């Protein structure tokens, strides 16, 4: 999976697991259709909606030069009812 970096586990993303929504950080150059294709192919699920946003960049100074560190987007992927991604499923307590 070229475009997907890793799954994100924040308070919000863990809360969204109950709504069958999964959060991933993806390469900034990847398109929405590529990400949808990779998720459906790799996890064998059906995607019904995708939301994406860019995170604010963090500054990084190396002597006199100021740069930034983040080069990715965050995608929130909603799956059809009945589908789930097993390693990321929330445990019921």
Swiss-Prot record:
<keyword id="KW-0934">Plastid</keyword>
<dbReference type="GO" id="GO:0009507">
    <property type="term" value="C:chloroplast"/>
</dbReference>
<keyword id="KW-0150">Chloroplast</keyword>
<keyword id="KW-0699">rRNA-binding</keyword>
<protein>
    <recommendedName>
        <fullName>Large ribosomal subunit protein uL23cz/uL23cy</fullName>
    </recommendedName>
</protein>
<keyword id="KW-0689">Ribosomal protein</keyword>
<dbReference type="InterPro" id="IPR012678">
    <property type="entry name" value="Ribosomal_uL23/eL15/eS24_sf"/>
</dbReference>
<dbReference type="InterPro" id="IPR001014">
    <property type="entry name" value="Ribosomal_uL23_CS"/>
</dbReference>
<keyword id="KW-0687">Ribonucleoprotein</keyword>
<dbReference type="GO" id="GO:0019843">
    <property type="term" value="F:rRNA binding"/>
</dbReference>
<comment type="similarity">
    <text>Belongs to the universal ribosomal protein uL23 family.</text>
</comment>
<dbReference type="GO" id="GO:0003729">
    <property type="term" value="F:mRNA binding"/>
</dbReference>
<dbReference type="GO" id="GO:0022625">
    <property type="term" value="C:cytosolic large ribosomal subunit"/>
</dbReference>
<keyword id="KW-0694">RNA-binding</keyword>
<comment type="function">
    <text>Binds to 23S rRNA.</text>
</comment>
<dbReference type="GO" id="GO:0003735">
    <property type="term" value="F:structural constituent of ribosome"/>
</dbReference>
<dbReference type="InterPro" id="IPR012677">
    <property type="entry name" value="Nucleotide-bd_a/b_plait_sf"/>
</dbReference>
<dbReference type="Pfam" id="PF00276">
    <property type="entry name" value="Ribosomal_L23"/>
</dbReference>
<comment type="subunit">
    <text>Part of the 50S ribosomal subunit.</text>
</comment>
<dbReference type="InterPro" id="IPR013025">
    <property type="entry name" value="Ribosomal_uL23-like"/>
</dbReference>
<dbReference type="GO" id="GO:0006412">
    <property type="term" value="P:translation"/>
</dbReference>
């Amino acid at each position: 999976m070229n475009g997907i970096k890793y799954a994100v586990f924040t308070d919000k993303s863990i809360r969204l697991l109950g709504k069958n929504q999964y959060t991933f950080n993806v390469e900034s150059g990847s398109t929405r259709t590529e990400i949808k294709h990779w998720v459906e192919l790799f996890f064998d699920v059906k995607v019904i909606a995708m939301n994406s946003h860019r995170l604010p960049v963090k500054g990084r100074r190396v002597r006199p030069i100021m740069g930034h560190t983040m080069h990715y987007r965050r995608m929130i992927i909603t799956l059809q009812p009945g589908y789930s991604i097993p390693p990321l499923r929330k445990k019921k307590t």
